[in-house]
């Protein structure tokens, strides 16, 4: 079974791998991709396999598949009768309708959306409730105060933040202090061998505040799976084919060149590239847990192998050099 670890100083024990449910009924939040991604049968098979492997934190959002992801998780929980064996993360902030009140982190929107998420998930509590991103139009004190109210009411056990830079995280922590509020348990940001700098600059803030850091997209949106090649178009239906804009400022061509070197390093070590890339992120002292998004139970099994791969600081540094285009090898 995948081992558990404490999420910062929250007192919440979580597995070191979370099941990312962003492909259930869609590909993340964009409405134009609703209905793509995994079907319900696949989603149920993934949740069955994840729980059996100890990957018992399911990470979703109100906006994934337009609510379908939460709904399928709720149906699965009801059919399996395992609510007390599973931890749930969901999120709020992304648009859920056309109007300005249908998004963001205002007290009204958070209150409305947490109730909608509870209904879809068929549960009376959310273990970890995340702000899906910053909301420049709402005072941070209003957002933190609302999360604090929900914790005190028992509606959510813990809350967290996502997609913040250092200034945003520090502003949130200042608001926590000024309100004497419950602090966030978690920061969830992108972090991988191909996307390291911005999140690693936050690790010291998280450590000082007792916040656990969870990394989403530890395979860089699938680039570190090895399924994409620099000289070939992306496979039909893949994330790169459907959401080429989802890679932000990352130069995909340069990244795929680096992936060739990383794949060679994985082959020399005798492990799959995705497992090596996940192990690199998981062995970072600043990282608590990773979100994984397998598309089949077999992929889940191969990703879980990452928890048994041990990397020294030297080996981790050599993988970074390869990711930056240095041809030196992991075994010297």
Protein language model annotation of sequence segments:
Residues 9, 52, 76-87, 118-122, ...:
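Acidic (Asp/Glu)-rich catalytic clusters
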Residues 118-139:
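Active-site groove signature of glycoside hydrolases
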Residues 1-86:
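N-terminal binding-site loop/beta-alpha segment at the start of enzyme catalytic domains
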Residues 27-41, 96-111, 132-138:
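Active-site mouth loops of central-metabolism enzymes
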Residues 36-50, 104-121, 169-173:
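Short, acidic/polar
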Residues 4, 134, 138-324:
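Beta/alpha (TIM)-barrel catalytic core signal, keyed to glycine-rich beta->alpha loops juxtaposed to Asp/Glu
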């Amino acid at each position: 079974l995948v081992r558990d670890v404490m999420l910062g100083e929250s007192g919440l024990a979580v597995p070191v791998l979370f099941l990312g449910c962003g492909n259930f009924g869609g590909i993340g939040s964009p409405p134009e991709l609703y209905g793509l991604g995994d079907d319900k049968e696949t989603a149920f098979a993934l949740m069955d396999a994840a729980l059996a492997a100890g990957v018992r934190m399911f990470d979703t959002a109100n906006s994934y598949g337009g609510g379908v992801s939460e709904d399928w998780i709720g149906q699965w929980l009801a059919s399996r009768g395992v609510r007390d064996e599973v931890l749930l993360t969901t999120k709020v902030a992304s648009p859920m309708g056309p109007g300005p009140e249908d998004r963001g982190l205002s007290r009204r929107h958070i209150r409305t959306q947490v109730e909608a998420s509870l209904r879809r998930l068929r549960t009376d509590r959310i273990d970890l409730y995340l702000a899906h991103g910053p909301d420049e139009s709402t005072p941070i004190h209003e957002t933190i105060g609302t999360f604090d109210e929900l914790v005190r009411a028992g509606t959510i056990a813990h809350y967290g933040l996502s997609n913040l830079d250092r200034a945003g995280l520090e502003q949130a922590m200042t608001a926590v202090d000024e309100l004497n509020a419950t602090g966030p348990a978690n920061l969830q940001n992108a972090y991988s061998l191909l996307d390291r700098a911005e999140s690693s600059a936050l690790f010291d803030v998280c450590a000082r505040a007792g916040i656990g850091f969870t990394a989403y997209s530890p395979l860089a949106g699938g680039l570190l799976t090895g399924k994409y090649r620099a000289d070939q178009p992306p496979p039909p239906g893949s994330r790169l084919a459907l959401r080429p804009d989802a890679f932000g400022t990352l130069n995909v061509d340069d990244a795929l060149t680096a992936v060739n070197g990383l794949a060679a390093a994985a082959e020399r070590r005798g492990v799959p590239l995705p497992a090596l890339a996940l192990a690199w992120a998981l062995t970072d002292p600043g990282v608590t847990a990773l979100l994984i998004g397998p598309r089949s139970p077999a992929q889940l099994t191969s990703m879980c192998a990452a928890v048994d791969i041990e990397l020294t600081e030297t080996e981790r540094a050599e993988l970074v050099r390869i990711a930056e285009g240095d041809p030196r090898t992991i075994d010297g």
